[in-house]
From Swiss-Prot:
Signal sequence bounds: none
Protein name per Swiss-Prot or TrEMBL: Protein B14 homolog
Organism phylogeny: Viruses, Varidnaviria, Bamfordvirae, Nucleocytoviricota, Pokkesviricetes
Protein family membership: Belongs to the poxviridae B14 protein family.
Source organism (scientific name): Rabbit fibroma virus (strain Kasza) (RFV)
InterPro entries documented for this protein: Poxvirus_Bcl-2-like, Poxvirus_sf
Length: 151
């Protein structure tokens, strides 16, 4: 079922939406049951740092509130976005939702991942998808294996 979990590259024909959905499903799976992830998911894991930058001290609170109050958490998340850096904020939303999936999905990952994916689809605008693609490709360069240099 996981299409992107072991991927180390992200090509022009790859779907950002499917990759993020796959990542959010993977995030809701208990750690002991997760498949080892490739570089694409390592990039998505780096989005959690963006969440801590954008949402600051509210990350834990938002994670705890998001399960029971999905609809109100959407409005809370929107209210905390300043819209001064759309790219970082889009990545932060993905990072935050991954933390929600991890926190709440442990015992029952399928309904949790479905709720988190639904929330993701409501929070991310279409124009942000291409920006997320750019971030994935740029950050993948950081995770690419270093070629040894012969001096």
């Amino acid at each position: 079922m996981a299409f992107y979990v072991r991927r180390n590259n992200f090509d022009a024909e790859d779907s950002v939406l499917l990759a993020v959905q796959d990542y959010l499903r993977w995030s809701s799976t208990p750690f002991r049951d997760r498949e080892p992830a490739g570089c694409v998911f390592a990039v998505f894991e780096s989005f959690k740092r963006d969440a801590s930058i954008v949402f600051r001290d509210n990350v834990r609170w938002l994670v705890r509130c998001s399960y029971k109050y999905v609809d109100s958490s959407e409005s809370l998340i929107r209210a905390m976005l300043r819209h001064d850096n759309y790219i970082t904020e889009a990545c932060a939303v993905i990072g935050l939702l991954a933390q929600v999936a991890e926190y709440w999905g442990y015992d029952n990952p399928i309904p949790i991942s479905a709720r988190v994916i639904e929330l993701f689809m409501r929070l991310i605008a279409d124009y942000e998808i291409s920006h997320i693609r750019s971030v994935i490709n740029i950050r993948l360069q950081c995770f690419a294996p270093r070629k040894s240099r012969n001096i």
